[in-house]
């Protein structure tokens, strides 16, 4: 069971009334049946209840903004919302893997799992077939998180406090040419293993597939954020870290700089 369809009805209702720029969320219970959980002498053991959070995004990213007149919502916007929720709950994003997912709900989907294998949810582009059946003419982006499992996950997290760094973070971008089957999660993993102390965040801000690229290739534009809590990083340190990350991406994924 899923929360998806109730939210899609609201998307359709609002879109037909010219309120097409959608940002919805809903909490609700979902019920699943698994015959493998059936136990002799225990009634209803094969049924389970899961409290979930659903997120729906559709339409333009910015309402009537002259500076961004045609900026549509995207799966990257939805992913940012999901990541912000996880961060606010205290989940370490470096231990979260966004992997490719194939199912009937999404035309392009991602599973959201921890490095230990716990599935926290799914997200992606809702199948056009489903949208058509509900008379929805625009792309809809949807994420569903298991609040039940998230609460179990954050119970394991130790809450720590530290002074905000007085020293600035540094951002460096790489435009990478990669095989189409390479996932962003692989880039995150390799980069984190390359620099555990000073690499604070990694963000994918552009994906390109099409003209002027070799067959079977895609381009990822990735930002790397570096920061030392005790001092300002100099160019020599930054260049050394980025060179190490770049070399490891080349050796392990066959990545090339564009």
Describe every region a protein language model picked out:
Residues 1-258:
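Extended beta-strand-rich architecture
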